[in-house]
């Protein structure tokens, strides 16, 4: 078998058809094979991540936090640059764009070849970067100073940068090729408004690549020179600013999200048009919705940076601009549903993946509305809520669309047909697996669990084990997928319709149509196996739900109910109360939208499913709901312009309706969002100022204006009896010695011109006392008074950190060279915990925040006694 494999590899590299090919179909096939290989690597990385997070403590990585950081970095790079982009743009784009526009090939065939062959060495460099010294553990954002020569002194980050450069050049060359091909090589008569929607999506994606990738190239080149040539673009010690890198990166990074999802939109449009036996509803609206998404995608980049210290007006602008993207996205969702309504729905594997895409992408988009609010994002930034959001958009958006397109075009590409039953098994396993993996992440994110950590407090255990179990199901679905391909190529089931694979579209090349691929070869076969399988899975899902509800109800009887917490931590500041109230307000509207989308999909499927295109569809069924609505009010749909009468067709009217309605919903969401945002920015004259400094191992705190605050400003003289009990306690602890506690009440603090400074380290698990919380207990907590206006000044001494306490509603980045500030007004006493939520090296999971909120009557005296005992005063 090994000799056979070596012979195949040798023949591959000596066969000019593949190595030096200029045929767009062969190059597209190479992209698909390369993307599949990269997808396996990325899936393995994701499985390692989920196995490590299956339980608290070290599971499979032996406590190597840097290795965990390297794996999450490689997982993101591989999935984005070497799986989704190659298969969606390079694979399907190369295969079908020339065919859909009637072109003999791409405009620059040799350029097409080199654009592919830049990807394997790029992937090789990325994988090598993981093996050089300790690897590149920077996250896919590669933020400095963590990516600087001080924090990553080896060549790993340099290799990762070179890998990104090669992948970027490959994408730029491909984008130029697609733009030239689509503009110059269409058959005569095929205008831009007659292009298939998949071609439009690839064209818009190519422009996004052309405008965004040079910015990324500039950012990582400046980072490279900072690391190796002593420049200081992002080094605060030399006058640079690490936030500049974030602006440059996200100017590329957010359009990159639409680079990944726009080809998916095109694929979904093709499949829905085919399997509903209808043309796409609102074609022009769909095109301009994609154009609007592309334009808006360039002006919303800073919604990834709400916590870095942007002023309130800037955050308000990016909140509004980000919300606007929901309008064209909603147009596309409802246009797809309108296409299905009134059609002749054929239930095949591609359509199953498309319906799954519609439901799950809608859910991911709605959580994006939540995160677009600068006020809410303060609580959710860099938590697993964000991870859940973008995986619902990508893992269940782009990837589901890829599988839909793969099954849809499989026989057109390979000449073989796949087993429909295994295709359905693949869909259901993947649908269940990805939901079980990512839906619980919303709950741990709301509870404040930081992302990109290899270890977590025990309270997050149950949701994480559920996510890890879901990832195993998803991996099984991938195995089923590759087994399906194996069966397709080894069962000799070539359909009779296909004579020559590479000339399959020849009879259709010059057909002037909005969609050259609306034809389909769907056999009229029995679906009995599918129905049996569907019944089994429905029974399985219902049984699993019943068992889960029963198990959850049993958990309510013991002490572990907090581990299944599905909401925010208990608030203790007015800001935290406001954030939770705003979240509930927004969630109501989003739940209604999700219900409407789900109801429309289910009712459409129930009403218009006919099993096969060969069945006759009663004419009464072809009248859509939207036609009925419009015909009712047809008399009111005309208007005069310059003495001419124009009738608004049903597509335009409906699109106007579902453009205005989402805009009104966004308005209802935006008004309280802006009110909360500006309220959060108000800093009342503080009684106490605390400076917070982040380090890679610990936090430092300074009561910087302690010397000007006197204890008797805040005393409640009716509470003197409490001090008698406190005095006995302190004397028992050896703090007061011979002095009375009451002597501290009536005289100013005896520490004029003194600033209290102390460091706060995590207490390791072996040193914890009974009842202490693992990963959250510190040796020196921060003391803050209740019902007092407090100002926090936050900065960093080395890399980026984030001071985040969920119960306070506070999350502020600690940036070297900057001094960010926020205000606190604490309403409850108690002990509150938080963690650093920014990736800051190997110690990311080991920088807890412990805050004691005490009664102001006791605060100054208690602080003085406590720190005097540790010789800090």
Curated annotation (Swiss-Prot):
Covalent link 1'-histidyl-3'-tyrosine (His-Tyr), residues: 254-258
Major localization listed first in the record, in broad terms: mitochondrion
Enzyme class, broadest EC rank: translocase
Entry EC no(s): 7.1.1.9
One Gene Ontology MF term: cytochrome-c oxidase activity
Binding site for Cu cation B: 254, 303-304
Protein name from the UniProt record: Cytochrome c oxidase subunit 1+2
Organism the protein comes from: Acanthamoeba castellanii
